[in-house]
Amino acid sequence: MDEGGGAGAAAAAAGNAAGAAVHHNARSAEDVFRDFRARRAGIVKALTTDVEKFYRQCDPEKENLCLYGLPNETWDVTLPAEEVPPELPEPALGINFARDGMIEKDWLSLVAVHSDAWLLSVAFYFGARFGFDKEARRRLFTMINGLPTVYEVVTGIAKKQTKVSNGSSKSNKSNPKPSKQSNSNSKPAKPPQPKDEEDSGPEGTEDEDQAYMCGACGETYANGEFWICCDVCEKWFHGKCVRITPAKAEHIKQYKCPGCSSKRSRE
């Protein structure tokens, strides 16, 4: 990351260009939600699959840094925009200063909470700019509320909530849960699906609860997607979220997700 005003200007340019794209092309709640979802995906990636890189970039010795989620599903840690007032609402300032003074998981959770607030502020900023009426604002909020928050994904709360939602309605299709294998070559390319309420019973295991959502982005499984399971934490991930293809998975004897790999390297 570049130092000084140049980095801040670059961040402002990136954020403002993204905002300009939405300004010119989007006029509906669905368009703003797509922008929200992409920025959220970038931030989730920073705090999960790219956490080692994110941790390094948040150097407490540097100036006030911010975490930006970008509309192309990437992220950037850089200085805040120099423009006053900024084109878009700004994320929390100085996230790097608390890094070494907190337990890592607590620090990541704090960044996640501030990121959730920023994502909402950007989405409803666009809503105000586009003159959304009550119904459009309600529709936008409903779509946003259908996704787990960044905080819920980072802390694992989203996986626990899945059990409640799955138990409240019956599934039309029952898919048995595949057995865990120690070798990734023999693992199925998709995660286990929620069982029918009558089959699963009132009590489910922690492992079953965590299998329904991607450990990186928090999204649920869709037919035809390639997923892979970590042999260490036994969480499931979209192949695209952890940059693993079916061909690459064939040659992996024991798969470790980015989170487990980064923990081992720092111990």
From Swiss-Prot:
InterPro entries: Alfin, Alfin_N, PHD_AL_plant, Zinc_finger_PHD-type_CS, Znf_FYVE_PHD, Znf_PHD, Znf_PHD-finger, Znf_RING/FYVE/PHD. Coiled coil: none annotated. Belongs to the Alfin family. Residues 162-207 are annotated as: Disordered. GO terms for biological process: chromatin organization; regulation of DNA-templated transcription. Histone-binding component that specifically recognizes H3 tails trimethylated on 'Lys-4' (H3K4me3), which mark transcription start sites of virtually all active genes. GO terms for molecular function: histone binding; transcription cis-regulatory region binding; transcription coregulator activity; zinc ion binding. Transmembrane segments: none annotated. A zinc finger (PHD-type) spans 211-263. Residues 165-188 have a biased composition (Low complexity). Gene3D superfamilies: Zinc/RING finger domain, C3HC4 (zinc finger). Its main location: nucleus. This is PHD finger protein ALFIN-LIKE 7. Interacts with H3K4me3 and to a lesser extent with H3K4me2. The keyword ATP-binding does not apply. It comes from the Eukaryota. It is found in: Nucleus. One of its GO terms (cellular component) is nucleus. PROSITE patterns: ZF_PHD_1 (PS01359), ZF_PHD_2 (PS50016). The PHD-type zinc finger mediates the binding to H3K4me3.
